[in-house]
Every structure is written in structure tokens, then in C-alpha cells.
Amino acid sequence: MTRILKVKPTRMELLRLKRRIKLAEKGHKILKEKQDALIMEFFTIYDEALALRREVNQKIAEAFEQLRLAEIDVGIVKLSEIALSVKSNKEIKIKRRNIMGVPVPLIEAEGFRRDPYERGYAFVSTSPKVDVTAETFEEVLELVTRLAEIEETLKRLAKEIEKTKRRVNALEYIIIPRMAETVKYISQHLDEMERENFFRLKRVKALLEAKAQG
């Protein structure tokens, strides 16, 4: 049995609770719509994440195959020298955007791809295979950065969905039922009081009439 709220069983309290129930039902409807929309958005992004994860895995495999070919072409020692001469890539800038009020990361992943001059090994004797290897790993970097953004977005959306679900369930299964049960209790109490008052007045009237006739 649903527990009732600890309130005075008065008509004023009854009206106040009825207003609270209407507000709670409206809030429940809004939160349920938000929850449903968040779930739809989550699965849309989830599908994108799965596709991107496959692309990342394929690109990583391709990058290591290019690295193997470059090592065969110039040798491990030369390849190590070239790697040590490469300049650091651009810094990643993390901004923020909102998805239905949920703050999620926005990572600027442009500008990772560079030419040999920007990488810093243009004047070192190298080979086209080294360039292809560098380009492929830069593509990996772009994809991995994008994947990190999407996966963090999914984590935050999942957290918000769970939070919203708890609020929806609290309203649906605890708060609204308790208020409704309390309204029922107060209504029954007031009806009982009205009946008692009616019979009391009826008895008083009968006594007064009997006294008047005697």
C-alpha cells in the first residue's frame, strides 16, 4: 500500500495537493519526452560510433602496414632518425556544445595532416613510402580524436538518460501515487466529517423539535 503524506486533512490541503499533482504530471510528461528524445539521440550517435570504430581499426591496420613497407624501404635505423626529426602536431582544442541541455565535448580535429616541410623531415633523405606512412597515421589521429569525442558524448548522454529515468520513475511510482493516495484519504476523511455533521445536525434538530412540542 502506498504511504500517504503527513499533512492535515483539510479542504485547503486537498486543493493544494490536487494542484501539486497536476504540476507533477506535467513535469513527468516533460521529463519522459526528454528521456525518449535523449535515447533516440544516444542510439543515433551510437551507430555513428560503431561505424567510426570500424573505420579506425581499418585505418590503424593500414597505417602499420605502411609502416612495415617504409621500414623495408629505408631500414629501421633511417626510419627511427626520420621519426625523431618529426615535429609535434598541432594541439587539440576542446570546446563544448549542448545536446538537449547536456554539455558534451567538441574537439577541433582539423589540421592534423601536414606536408613533409611541416613535419620537419623535408631535408632528410627519405622515400615516398615514409610520406604515405606519415599521412596514414595523421588520418588515424583525426579519426581517433573524432572517436574520442563521440564516445565521451555517449558517456555523458547515458549518464543524463539514467538521471532523467530516475526522476521519471520517482514521479511515476512514488511521488504522484503518494499524493494521489493522500488526496483520496483527505477526500474520504472530509466526506466522513460531512456525514457526521449531517447526522449531528439532524439529531439536534430532532431534539429541538421534540422539546418544542413538549
UniProtKB/Swiss-Prot annotation:
Keyword Phosphoprotein: no
Main location: membrane
Alphabetized GO MF terms: ATP binding; proton-transporting ATP synthase activity, rotational mechanism; proton-transporting ATPase activity, rotational mechanism
Keyword check for Ion transport: yes
Any single Pfam family the record assigns to this protein: ATP-synt_D
One cellular component (GO) term of this entry: plasma membrane
A GO biological process held by the record: proton motive force-driven plasma membrane ATP synthesis
Keywords per UniProt: ATP synthesis, Cell membrane, Hydrogen ion transport, Ion transport, Membrane, Transport
Coiled-coil ranges per UniProt: none
Compartments, record wording: Cell membrane
Topology in membrane: Peripheral membrane protein
Subunit structure: Has multiple subunits with at least A(3), B(3), C, D, E, F, H, I and proteolipid K(x).
Function description: Component of the A-type ATP synthase that produces ATP from ADP in the presence of a proton gradient across the membrane.
Entries under HAMAP family matching the protein: ATP_synth_D_arch
Family recorded in the similarity comment: Belongs to the V-ATPase D subunit family.
Name of the protein this chain belongs to: A-type ATP synthase subunit D
Lineage, uppermost ranks: Archaea, Methanobacteriati, Methanobacteriota, Thermococci, Thermococcales
